[in-house]
């Protein structure tokens, strides 16, 4: 040491001389004296002896080398000396302020003095790099001091525009990482440092065009602002409350508000810089609370003319309005929405005022007008979103109406009058502008109908559209048309069927000319609404009339579409004007039809159908119409009437009307062939037939209706193409086709049902997505097929139709199908019609479509029928069983019992009487019904039936049901025993099923054996086992059924031989081993046979484990059972086990070290074998070196790790493998944590040190700090381990004071070892702390490896010395003696060091030595924790408690170690109340580890204090959380009743601990 100190003095003298004479060469000198090895000593020497010279150098003309020296000293070894460097120098000195102000002199310097500019810039850059180092590596206190220094902040930001790009990049990244995104830096500090002026200075960097590594500086600045200002809850951005008023912070009167960002966005150049514009939009999106004020202040100052300023203003406004509605719009906590004025300002800002809008709309520039319209559309879209949010909110309906009214009125006042937009729409020719204006008008109709409907708008202005083929392909034109269609629905008194300009014809032609689905949907929806307001069509039609009309036009030539639609339009116009006259015609037609058909119900026919037929002769008489047009109209009428008949109109009535047409009135030159074809089609449909001949099929609807069965195919459908809009019509046509086939006696309808399924799948099942889809409604309504439901002659159709409905899930509640089935069942059960029972099977199929309500409703009627008609049920069981089965299935799935006891009795007998579907259903439902069957007499009818059973004729289902009865009803057991005893031959035929029955009976035997003939049963079981043992051993799933029988039988030794011989490499069922164990317990097996069996199993497992890459679940269970077998035969195995067999097995088993059952088996073998029976050393080396050893990773469970540690300990002990190689390998696996597996290894390592003077510490060679955060490497001679200061800190706060040494004698006995291993999950263990022995040993190793200043500082700062101090609170005196001895030896080593805090550390250690004179005195956990924490505080003079703790030790040498230190000083501090109280509570929480610690807390009335504190208004949520943790720890230590009894804090405990009722009950008992 002396020579070292002499060398150091020489080096320091040399360094001093260089510093005085050549400050520029300091770095070179430091390299020559090996700066890295003794850095702290040199740094101390420089700062202590040459501080004045450093100041002189800094004030000189060339301070760059000195600044570089300070930076290197501060950054050495990840900032280990950063605090020293920072505290040694006054950074608020004018020297540094002047350096930061120098760049401002560049503007005043002479233009030609380039060298001066470079020098000035270098000085500031070097200083900034030094500050960056302090921010990165310094403590939070250093950062806070730098950030709060206004003298440095102002010149820093003032000259930042002229800084070097590389320095700016480092500075921005440092600010972002270590200030803005660091949660340890308070929000107030961030906002004070980065205020609006600072941010504006930084924003000036947007104008610089420098590049750094190919990235422009402005992009780096932009990224900095985006990360710092646009993430809610991070950086400078508070979490916004949307448009709501800001909430108050807990305990404060102020509200959180983004005021800095609000001021900052006004200073950004949004109209000239793209990046700044993007930044503003992102800030507004993250902080919607400042959007309204920004829009209000960012108003337009010039006229709305085509200028850059106008375009920029409007585009920015559109971008802001295009943002989504901020969350939450409706605040569930306050049950409010934002203030109305804020909502309105965010929808239509006042800066975009009505005069400005009117000037823009009425101006001459169409582009300005277009931009204005787009901005208004953005406002309307936001209005739409706001109103939708209001509808979804939980406000009352009255409040919703009132709020919507306020918003609508306010927005309407800010908008121009709707007349302005109507006039502009009618006068403009631009497609883009027309589309936008049409959308605005649509919004007016939607949200302000009263305003726009006051205008008398001519419908014709919306119908002046070009319907040329290319027009609808243009997106804007198509959107325009969609808007017009929506507007037409809102216009009042639209003449839809006007003869001159008919909107109906216009929309139909548009539908036929476009292929865009959205436009088509809009047209169909609009025309549906139109037709729904008239009575020209029958209301009962299955398909909307417009679909029928449009589908009928499919095969008409496009050139004739207009002629057909004009004919239809004129007929509709006539029908509407004379609808009642046509109704009279319909009534007359009804009367004649009823006479002819003798039907009671009136047939369906539409007035428009009457009109069309009436107008046929007048239309054909017109000579100005071409024959082609007439043919087209008649052909269309043929399709239309055919489709109407399929959807519900009566064909007979239509044919009757057609017969009355005056054919002689036709044009003499016109042929009657088209009309005759029309008559032929309708006549065929009227008599339920298909036409004999079809001239030409031109559409898919015609193809589906008129093509023959052979012609109908998927290829034909694809040929015509399918319009998804007409899918309901196609389905109805196919059902009509099926009805015609069924009427003619043709039952081959399955093809047509599959065709419906394919049509639905072809449409990608879009129509089946919802329960109200038209396809589901059509199918469940059973259009055209209802007359054939549940009819005797249509049974096959009903089966096919039911399966189809089930597969397509096409039924809905209350559908025609369900209603029809329910009516049929009600009638069948009430009338008791024998013929209907055959159809009940069909009805049961349809029951799968029922809802829960329909099932429950039907069950009441069924329950009554079952109770009164049991004989009828038994007689027709084959018919009614499917229906009863569905009821049982419903019962088992819904857990709802629908039947009375009488009905259940009937069902039970019916289920066991005959094997039917009911037997299956009863087996599933019986367990569900068990809790609700209170009277077991319901089983008596079934019991009488079972008494007469012949088991040889029983079906499998009946036997399974019997086994269920056995477990359910005691009455059945004796009956079934007698059945089995009298039917032994049945076991030979049906052993697998009857074995289940025997097994269930045998399980109940012990409790009820007095009721049976014991000898006869025992003989029976023995016979069953003997006759079926070979069969059972071949089928692993039957083995478990043998156990109950084996227990009741008289086993033989030959059974043991058979069972053991059944094992092989491919057959290892766990039940075989259980049988071996059972047999060994029942009879005396010769030891030679047992050894032979176990050796054979060893050989089989050796091969299996060698060939298996991993152990499966079945093999895991087998190994567990094998372990039990070995434990039963330990005595004979120790003498008889073969060494080679055992070695081979262990070698193959060690491969699977991650299997728990395998490890438990190896552990059992380790206790079974002797040192001579296996090579324990080799197997120990294999386990330690295994790459998948559970102790080496974190994936395995603690249970597996504890077992592995026990195996290592046992193999080491029995083989006496106490070698250095084994020691080093154990050290690799040893983590030193306070867990069961590490504790076992720790005791083993301690035992190593007692043998042959082996030192664990000698295996370490030193330590270094890594680049990882809070991590250090303690290197061993053959590897390295990791020390974590974080875990050391946890150890101090959660120290295991009750640690007890584990005696290695536990490994003398397997049972004791297993008892120890079962505690692996005990609350005692904690993987987040170090083991006390490890903490002592590792700290001693650190100190032994290096006693330099840096090492001593690490030991103290990183809580390693604190762990030794905590060792004084251990209950074990030997451990306390070692810790106290370490501390006594540490003080002399500390005296030899030279660092500033040395005397402070000695002050704490001296207090420990004085107040803990010997190891006999145990220090309380609380006091030990206070001492440990004091050591870390003494190393940080900037710590807020440094002054108080220092004063505490200076004022007293002797302290009361049984008291709470600094209790009142911390509870009632003069300054910084929150931090003091928080630290006191932290100390109280850490000091509460054992029951003995509770005495100190009770004596000082701690719990009364913390309860008072908890309810105080001056504490924050963190303090309350800490108080809750203290109370929870008291309850965990068993002090809950004491708190309730003596401290009366039950209400608070009940609030903190939800499940505190048990504690209260214990308190009452103890008090009593």
Swiss-Prot record:
Biological processes, Gene Ontology terms: maturation of 5.8S rRNA from tricistronic rRNA transcript (SSU-rRNA, 5.8S rRNA, LSU-rRNA); maturation of LSU-rRNA from tricistronic rRNA transcript (SSU-rRNA, 5.8S rRNA, LSU-rRNA)
Alphabetized Pfam families for the sequence: NopRA1, Npa1
Gene Ontology CC entries for this record: cytosol; nucleolus; nucleus
Cystine pairings recorded for this chain: none
Record InterPro entries: NopRA1_C, Npa1_N, URB1
PANTHER family in UniProt: NUCLEOLAR PRE-RIBOSOMAL-ASSOCIATED PROTEIN 1 (PTHR13500:SF0), NUCLEOLAR PRERIBOSOMAL-ASSOCIATED PROTEIN 1 (PTHR13500)
Protein's UniProt name: Uncharacterized protein C14G10.02
Organism of this sequence: Schizosaccharomyces pombe (strain 972 / ATCC 24843) (Fission yeast)
């Amino acid at each position: 040491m002396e020579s070292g100190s002499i060398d150091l003095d020489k080096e320091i003298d040399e360094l001093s001389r260089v510093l005085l004479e050549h400050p520029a060469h300091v770095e070179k000198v430091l390299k020559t004296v090996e700066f890295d090895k003794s850095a702290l000593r040199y740094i101390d020497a420089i700062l202590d002896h040459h501080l004045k010279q450093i100041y002189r150098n800094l004030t000189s003309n060339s301070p760059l080398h000195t600044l570089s020296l300070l930076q290197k000293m501060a950054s050495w070894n990840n900032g280990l000396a950063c605090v020293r460097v920072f505290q040694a120098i006054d950074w608020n000195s004018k020297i540094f302020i002047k350096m930061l102000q120098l760049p401002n002199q560049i503007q005043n310097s002479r233009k030609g003095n380039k060298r001066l500019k470079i020098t000035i810039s270098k000085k500031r850059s070097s200083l900034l790099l030094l500050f960056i180092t302090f921010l990165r590596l310094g403590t939070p206190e250093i950062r806070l001091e730098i950030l709060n220094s206004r003298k440095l902040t102002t010149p820093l930001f003032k000259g930042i525009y002229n800084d070097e790009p590389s320095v700016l990049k480092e500075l921005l990244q440092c600010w972002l990482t270590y200030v803005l995104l660091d949660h340890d830096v308070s929000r107030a500090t961030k906002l004070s440092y980065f205020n609006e002026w600072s941010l504006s200075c930084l924003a000036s960097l947007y104008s610089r065009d420098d590049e750094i590594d190919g990235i422009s500086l402005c992009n780096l600045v932009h990224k900095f602002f985006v990360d710092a200002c646009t993430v809610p809850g991070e950086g400078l951005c508070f979490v916004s409350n949307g448009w709501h008023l800001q909430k108050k912070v807990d305990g404060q009167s102020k509200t959180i508000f983004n005021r800095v960002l609000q001021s900052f966005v006004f200073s950004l150049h949004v109209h000239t810089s793209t990046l700044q514009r993007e930044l503003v939009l992102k800030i507004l999106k993250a902080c919607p609370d400042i959007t309204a004020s920004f829009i209000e202040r960012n108003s337009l100052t010039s006229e709305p003319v085509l200028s850059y300023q106008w375009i920029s203003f409007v585009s920015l406004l559109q971008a802001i309005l295009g943002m989504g509605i901020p969350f939450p719009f409706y605040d569930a906590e306050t049950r409010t929405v934002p203030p109305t004025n804020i909502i309105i300002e965010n929808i239509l800002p006042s800066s975009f005022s009505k005069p400005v809008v009117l000037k823009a709309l009425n101006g001459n520039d169409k582009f300005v007008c277009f931009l204005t319209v787009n901005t208004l559309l953005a406002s309307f879209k936001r209005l739409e979103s706001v109103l939708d949010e209001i509808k979804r909110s939980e406000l009352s309906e009255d409040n919703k109406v009132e709020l919507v009214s306020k918003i609508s009125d306010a927005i309407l006042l800010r908008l121009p009058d709707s007349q302005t937009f109507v006039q502009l729409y009618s006068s403009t020719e631009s497609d883009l502008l027309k589309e936008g204006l049409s959308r605005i008008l649509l919004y007016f109709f939607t949200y302000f109908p009263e305003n726009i409907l006051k205008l008398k708008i001519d419908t014709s202005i919306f119908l002046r559209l070009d319907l040329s083929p290319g027009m609808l392909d243009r997106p804007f034109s198509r959107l325009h048309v969609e808007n017009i269609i929506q507007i037409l629905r809102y216009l009042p008194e639209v003449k839809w069927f006007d003869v001159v300009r008919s909107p109906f014809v216009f929309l139909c032609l548009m539908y036929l000319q476009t292929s865009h689905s959205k436009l088509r949907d809009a047209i169909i929806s609009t025309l549906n609404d139109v037709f729904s307001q008239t009575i020209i069509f029958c209301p009962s039609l299955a398909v909307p009339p417009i679909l029928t009309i449009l589908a009928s036009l499919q095969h008409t030539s496009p050139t004739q579409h207009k002629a057909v639609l004009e004919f239809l339009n004129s007929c509709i116009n006539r029908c509407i004007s004379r609808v009642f006259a046509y109704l009279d015609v319909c009534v007359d037609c009804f009367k004649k039809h009823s006479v002819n058909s003798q039907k009671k119900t009136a047939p369906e026919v539409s007035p428009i159908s009457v009109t069309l037929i009436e107008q046929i002769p007048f239309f054909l008489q017109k000579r100005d119409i071409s024959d082609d047009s007439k043919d087209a109209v008649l052909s269309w009428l043929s399709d239309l009437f055919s489709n109407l008949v399929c959807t519900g109109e009566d064909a007979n009535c239509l044919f009757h009307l057609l017969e009355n047409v005056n054919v002689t009135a036709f044009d003499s030159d016109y042929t009657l062939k088209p009309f005759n074809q029309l008559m032929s089609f309708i006549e065929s449909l009227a008599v339920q037939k298909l036409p004999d001949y079809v001239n030409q099929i031109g559409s898919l609807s015609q193809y589906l209706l008129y093509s023959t069965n052979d012609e109908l195919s998927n290829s034909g459908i694809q040929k015509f193409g399918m319009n998804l809009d007409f899918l309901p019509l196609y389905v109805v046509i196919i059902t009509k086709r099926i009805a015609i086939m069924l009427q003619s006696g043709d039952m081959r309808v399955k093809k047509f049902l599959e065709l419906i399924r394919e049509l639905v799948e072809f449409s990608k099942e879009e129509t089946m997505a919802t329960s109200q889809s038209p396809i589901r409604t059509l199918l469940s309504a059973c259009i055209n097929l209802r007359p054939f439901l549940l009819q005797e002659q249509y049974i096959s159709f009903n089966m096919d139709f039911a399966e189809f409905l089930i597969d397509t899930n096409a039924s809905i509640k209350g559908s025609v199908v369900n209603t029809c089935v329910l009516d049929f069942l009600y009638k069948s059960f009430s009338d008791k019609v024998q013929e209907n029972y055959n159809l009940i099977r069909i009805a049961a199929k349809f029951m799968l479509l029922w809802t829960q309500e329909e099932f429950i409703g039907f069950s009441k009627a069924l329950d009554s029928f079952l109770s009164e008609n049991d004989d009828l049920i038994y007689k027709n069981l084959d018919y009614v069983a499917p229906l009863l089965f569905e009821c049982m299935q419903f019962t088992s799935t819904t857990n709802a019992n629908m039947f009375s006891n009488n009905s259940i009795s009937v069902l039970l007998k019916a289920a066991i009487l005959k094997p039917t579907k009911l037997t299956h259903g009863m087996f599933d439902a019986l367990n569900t019904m068990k809790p609700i069957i209170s009277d077991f007499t319901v089983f008596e009818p079934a019991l009488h039936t079972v008494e007469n059973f012949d088991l040889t004729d029983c079906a499998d289902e009946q036997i399974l049901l019997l086994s269920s009865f056995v477990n359910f009803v005691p009455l059945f057991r004796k009956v079934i025993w007698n059945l089995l005893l009298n039917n032994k031959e049945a076991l030979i035929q049906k052993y697998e099923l009857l074995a289940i029955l025997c097994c269930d009976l045998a399980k109940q035997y012990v409790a009820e054996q007095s009721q049976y003939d014991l000898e006869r049963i025992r003989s029976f079981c023995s016979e069953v086992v003997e006759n079926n043992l070979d069969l059972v051993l071949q089928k692993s799933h039957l083995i478990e059924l043998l156990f109950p029988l084996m227990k009741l039988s008289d086993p033989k030794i030959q059974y043991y031989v058979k069972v053991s011989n059944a094992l092989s490499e491919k057959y290892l069922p766990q039940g075989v081993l259980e049988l071996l164990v059972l047999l060994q317990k029942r009879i005396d097996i010769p030891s030679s046979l047992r050894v032979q069996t176990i050796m054979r199993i060893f050989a089989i497992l050796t091969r299996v484990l060698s060939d298996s890459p991993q152990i499966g679940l079945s093999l895991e269970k087998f190994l567990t059972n094998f372990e039990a077998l070995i434990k039963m035969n330990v005595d004979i195995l120790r003498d008889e086990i073969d060494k080679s067999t055992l070695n081979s097995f262990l070698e193959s088993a060690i491969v699977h070290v991650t299997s728990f059952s395998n490890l438990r088996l190896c552990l059992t073998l380790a206790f079974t074998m002797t040192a001579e029976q296996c090579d324990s050393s080799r197997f120990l080396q294999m386990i330690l070196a295994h790459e998948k050893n559970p102790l080496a990773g974190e994936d395995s469970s603690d249970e597996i790790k504890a077992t592995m540690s026990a195996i290592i300990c046992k193999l080491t002990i029995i083989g006496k493998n106490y070698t250095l190689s084994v020691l080093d390998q154990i050290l690799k696996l040893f983590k030193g944590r306070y867990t069961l597996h590490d504790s076992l290894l720790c005791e083993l390592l301690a035992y190593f040190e007692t043998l042959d003077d082996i030192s664990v510490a000698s295996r370490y060679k030193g330590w270094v700090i890594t680049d990882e955060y809070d991590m250090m490497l303690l290197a061993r001679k053959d590897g390295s381990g990791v020390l974590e200061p974080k875990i050391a800190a946890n150890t101090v706060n959660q120290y295991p004071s009750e640690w007890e040494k584990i005696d290695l004698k536990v490994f003398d006995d397997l049972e004791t070892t297993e008892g120890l291993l079962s505690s692996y999950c005990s609350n005692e263990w904690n993987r987040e702390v170090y083991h006390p022995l490890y903490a002592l040993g590792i700290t001693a190793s650190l100190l032994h490896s290096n006693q330099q200043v840096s090492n001593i500082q690490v030991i103290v700062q990183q809580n390693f010395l604190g762990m030794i101090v905590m060792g004084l609170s251990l209950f074990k005196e030997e451990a306390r003696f070692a810790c106290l001895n370490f501390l006594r030896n540490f003080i002399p080593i500390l005296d030899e060091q030279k660092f500033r805090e040395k005397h402070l550390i000695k002050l704490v250690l001296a207090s420990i030595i004085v107040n803990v004179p010997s190891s006999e005195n145990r220090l309380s956990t609380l006091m030990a924790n206070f001492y440990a924490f004091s050591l870390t505080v003494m190393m940080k003079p900037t710590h807020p408690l440094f002054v108080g703790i220092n004063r505490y030790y200076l004022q007293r040498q002797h302290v009361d170690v049984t008291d709470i230190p600094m209790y009142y000083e911390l509870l009632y501090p003069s300054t910084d109340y929150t931090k003091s109280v928080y630290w006191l509570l932290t100390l109280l929480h850490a000091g509460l580890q054992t029951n003995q610690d509770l005495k100190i807390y009770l004596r000082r009335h701690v719990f009364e204090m913390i309860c008072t504190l908890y309810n105080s208004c001056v504490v924050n949520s963190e303090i309350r959380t800490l108080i809750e943790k203290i109370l929870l720890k008291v309850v965990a230590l068993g002090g809950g009743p004491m708190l309730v009894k003596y401290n009366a804090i039950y209400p608070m405990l009940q609030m903190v601990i939800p499940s505190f009722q048990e504690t209260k009950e214990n308190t009452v008992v103890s008090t009593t």
